[in-house]
């Protein structure tokens, strides 16, 4: 379920009891339906941003892995907290918001490297585009003064930047946007190239441009041309 906004002035500010009940419902629904039953959490700019999740876990039988917090690179202090949180729970970084707010946002490719250096398991790190999501800009009084939109293509740009600028192996960068996401969300037919799974394949040239693309076994792009 989700996204559920917490630690954000735009959220409905769910109480600990409400959050527990909501995520417990997601868990039970996942068990009955053979799905992950995970709760995607929109993380806001409030201080101590993970506190609502910690409180829910401390007052229930829920585990940190039942929560999937996103926008964890939106400012320096949430990112620092994510380094500790990510050792036991999952951490999702947002690709499309940088360089929209470069004074606050942590560059997502750099964030991947820093999380790994801090001891966060690779399998706990994901990157999503938040494509078509809103990128609001507020003044000091909290008034909305402008609005932009995240782009789906940002995820590809960040993945390439992780390899070319941050010098991570391609297989590491690819895992953050493929197999890690599929494993956490239990998307059994996604995230890997194996017999019996959906044949979703992106082929890149030496300059990391998409030359060919296959979706569920169907050729969608061949020799740089969309079919």
At which residue positions do the language-model features occur?
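Alpha-helical elements of the RecA-like P-loop NTPase motor core of helicases
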Residues: 51, 183, 211
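Active-site core of metal-dependent hydrolases
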Residues: 8-138, 144-145
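His/Asp/Glu-enriched, well-ordered alpha-helical/loop segment
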Residues: 117-204
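C-terminal cap of metal-dependent C-N hydrolases
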Residues: 192-227
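Short secondary-structure capping/turn micro-motifs that flank functional sites
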Residues: 100-101, 179, 212
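Acidic, His- and aromatic-enriched active-site or binding-groove loops in soluble protein domains
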Residues: 1-4, 64
């Amino acid at each position: 379920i989700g996204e559920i906004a917490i630690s954000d002035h735009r959220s409905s500010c769910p109480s600990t009891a409400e959050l527990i009940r909501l995520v417990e419902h997601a868990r039970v629904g996942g068990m009955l339906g053979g799905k992950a039953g995970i709760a995607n959490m929109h993380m806001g700019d409030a201080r101590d941003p993970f506190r609502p999740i910690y409180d829910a876990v401390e007052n229930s039988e829920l585990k940190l892995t039942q929560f999937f917090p996103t926008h964890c690179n939106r400012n320096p202090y949430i990112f620092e907290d994510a380094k500790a949180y990510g050792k036991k729970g999952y951490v999702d970084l947002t690709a499309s918001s940088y360089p929209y707010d470069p004074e606050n946002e942590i560059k997502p490719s750099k964030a991947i490297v820093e999380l790994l250096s801090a001891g966060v398991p690779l399998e706990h790190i994901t990157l999503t585009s938040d494509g078509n999501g809103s990128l609001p800009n507020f003044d000091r009084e909290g008034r909305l003064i402008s609005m932009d939109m995240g782009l789906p293509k940002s995820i590809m740009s960040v993945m390439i930047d992780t390899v070319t600028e941050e010098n991570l192996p391609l297989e590491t960068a690819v895992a953050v946007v493929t197999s890690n996401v599929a494993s956490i969300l239990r998307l059994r037919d996604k995230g890997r190239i194996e017999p019996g799974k959906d044949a979703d394949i992106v082929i890149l040239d030496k300059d990391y441009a998409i030359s060919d693309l296959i979706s569920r076994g169907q050729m969608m792009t061949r020799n740089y041309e969309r079919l």
